[in-house]
């Protein structure tokens, strides 16, 4: 792990909150040393020309399912942190260790195993065999022990799956309201956030009554109501809409335009390009239109919206780690966020909501996770894919494709 010193000079800076048209950013020993109007460099310090470019904080994907080699794929597209929302601890332990030691991988936080019931989501999507590999919550008495076990595994937050399947054309059991509330309370007792997987408006209402801190999907079975928007605002929750995955589930949107984009295609293995170009096609009664409208209205009301993709493994179609984040930003803009607001949803907002105080902004003393792009994504969001440089803890990434097209098959749910 090297520790270089350099400056990025005469660059437009989006610092996670606002745009500064002309700055110089000084990085030393993996941290941002200074953000100034001018900098008198010496011959010993590398100077990166930022003219015509925009410097962003490294992107934070607020909903993934991390598995080797997803952290490498994520970083290739400027995602410097993934927030995993359901993974087996055996896989996560190694990924945490590698991310702590290496700067060619994105960092990761995890919910470990999500709380669901026997036969509940995601069993209808991944099959009985995979679903049976995970512990479930069988009764109210299990709630405290389930949360304690996840905390012992290293969970950074606790996830509840409140989903009866109706938005996806299924009918499956789900957590009861008393059990969900007990899980959320137990998470808070351990000093952890509780986040809720929902796909229906009724599920969202139940999650809010249970006391979750955030919803990690937007409901899409029906249009939003004034009541649900008021409840979300009153509860102070954030919402990660995962519009990329909602589009795939509702068979409306896939990642074909990303797979075929000349800025991305050379860096995406063939198996992942194929994955991007498909939808789940579940024939669900839900609609991406409902989710986009709900995102728009929640955002207008003042609910914090975070950017997340729900990217998982091969077989979880419609998304891919890293590159799908750029498509998600486009969808957030389609849902009514300005480009600057969409960029906040991928940087400072998730950092604040998930307690990542060392990242998500460009400011002195913070970690030098940086994304340099050609053009101005604060005006045209698609410019985020015109990548000119990526730094992880101050080390510049060499953007080359992975050595192999070998990828993990589906072993974790898209939830």
Regions found by a protein language model. Give the residues of each.
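Histidine-rich, glycine-flanked metal-binding segment
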Residues: 1-6, 13-56
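C-terminal cap of metal-dependent C-N hydrolases
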Residues: 11, 327, 338, 346-348, ...
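Histidine-centered catalytic micro-motifs
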Residues: 57-67, 187, 193-199
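Divalent-metal coordination cores built from histidine and acidic residues
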Residues: 71-193, 228-266
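Histidine/acidic-residue-rich catalytic or RNA/ligand-binding cores of hydrolases
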Residues: 72, 204-211, 245-265, 291, ...
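His/Asp/Glu-enriched, well-ordered alpha-helical/loop segment
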Residues: 189, 275-281, 288-376
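Glycine-enriched alpha-helix->loop->beta-strand junction motifs that scaffold or abut catalytic
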Residues: 208-215, 234-238, 302-303
């Amino acid at each position: 792990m090297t520790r270089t010193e350099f400056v990025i000079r005469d660059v437009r800076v989006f610092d996670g909150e606002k745009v500064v048209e002309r700055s110089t950013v000084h990085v030393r020993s993996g941290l941002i040393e200074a953000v100034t109007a001018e900098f008198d460099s010496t011959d010993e310090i590398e100077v990166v020309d930022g003219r015509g470019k925009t410097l962003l904080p490294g992107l934070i994907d607020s909903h993934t399912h991390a598995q080797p080699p997803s952290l490498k794929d994520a970083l290739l597209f400027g995602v410097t942190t993934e927030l995993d929302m359901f993974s087996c601890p055996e896989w996560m332990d190694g990924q945490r260790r590698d991310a702590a030691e290496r700067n060619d991988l994105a960092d990761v936080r995890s919910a470990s195993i999500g709380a669901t019931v026997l036969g509940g989501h995601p069993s209808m999507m991944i099959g009985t065999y995979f679903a049976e590999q995970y512990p479930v919550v069988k009764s109210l008495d299990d709630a405290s022990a389930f949360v304690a076990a996840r905390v012992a595994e290293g969970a950074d937050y606790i996830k509840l799956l409140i989903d009866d399947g109706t938005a996806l054309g299924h009918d499956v059991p789900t957590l009861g309201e008393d059990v969900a509330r007990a899980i959320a309370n137990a998470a808070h007792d351990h000093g952890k956030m509780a986040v809720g997987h929902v796909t229906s408006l009724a599920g969202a209402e139940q999650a809010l009554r249970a006391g979750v801190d955030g919803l990690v999907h937007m409901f899409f079975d029906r249009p939003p109501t004034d009541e649900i928007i008021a409840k979300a605002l009153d509860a102070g929750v954030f919402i990660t809409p995962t519009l990329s995955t909602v589009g795939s589930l509702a068979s409306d949107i896939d990642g074909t335009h990303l797979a075929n984009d000349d800025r991305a295609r050379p860096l995406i293995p063939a198996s992942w390009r194929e994955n991007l170009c498909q939808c789940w096609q579940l024939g669900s009664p839900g609609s991406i239109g409902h989710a986009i409208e709900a995102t728009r209205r929640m955002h207008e009301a003042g609910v914090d919206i975070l950017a997340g993709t729900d990217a998982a493994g091969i077989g979880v179609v419609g998304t891919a780690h890293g590159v799908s984040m750029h498509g998600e930003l486009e969808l957030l803009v389609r849902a009514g966020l300005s480009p600057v607001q969409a960029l906040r949803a991928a940087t400072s907002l998730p950092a604040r909501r998930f307690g990542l105080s060392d990242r998500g902004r460009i400011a002195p003393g913070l970690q030098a996770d940086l994304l340099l792009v050609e053009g101005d994504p604060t005006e045209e969001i698609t410019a985020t894919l015109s990548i000119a440089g990526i730094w992880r803890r101050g080390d510049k990434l060499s953007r080359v494709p992975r050595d192999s097209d070998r990828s993990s098959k589906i072993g974790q749910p898209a939830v």
